[in-house]
Amino acid sequence: IESYDIITYLEAKFPSPTLIPESQRDKVGALLNFEDRLHMDLRALTMRFFVPAAIVQRSDAQLAQYHAAGSGQVRGSADDHKADEMAFWRDMKEHNGVPETRTKAAVEAFPAAFDDHEVALAMRPYLLGETLSVLDIAWYVYANRLRGAGYPLAHLHPRVGAWFAKLDQ
């Protein structure tokens, strides 16, 4: 997760205020990996509801160039995101946009995650505790994008809706 790597670097360089509580570093990593697995769902909804397909459509040449680029590894491990990226862009090209089945699956991916946050926010003001963390920042982006796509965040998840409104001020 590049953004997590950047935050980790900034956290080491500028330790105050802390965005990754030391006592929860492993938990943060696991939760951000979960958030990262939903990235393609967020992209599908963004491309379906915000961005006209013609603007983001990739040509065969662009797809071939992307496929050939890079080492195929991240931190010495196979880059499993690349195959997902290629499949996403090929589907976009084949269907001239995000297919209905992909959109439906993406919509269904988020309620359980927000339900987990609903439980956490019943016990504390932020996702990890009493202060803002990198997890709040990551999920703010998702909540903002999904709200813009018409997801009824405050209706389905009132605590998450209140948390979002507080961060959105």
Segments and roles (model prediction):
Residues I1-S77:
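GST-like domain detector, emphasizing the conserved glutathione-binding G-site
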Residues I7, E11, G29-L32, P111-F114, ...:
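Non-transmembrane alpha-helical segments in soluble domains
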Residues F14, T18-L19, H95-A106:
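Surface-exposed cleft-lining segments at the edges of enzyme active sites
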Residues A68-N96, E108-D115:
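A structural motif
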Residues P99-R102, A106-A120, Y142, W163:
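Alpha-helical packing segments of well-folded alpha/beta enzyme cores
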Residues V119-E130, Q169:
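Surface-exposed helix-capping loop/turn segments at secondary-structure junctions
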Residues L127-R147:
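GST superfamily/GST-like fold recognition
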Residues A143-Q169:
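Long, positively charged, glycine-interspersed low-complexity recognition regions
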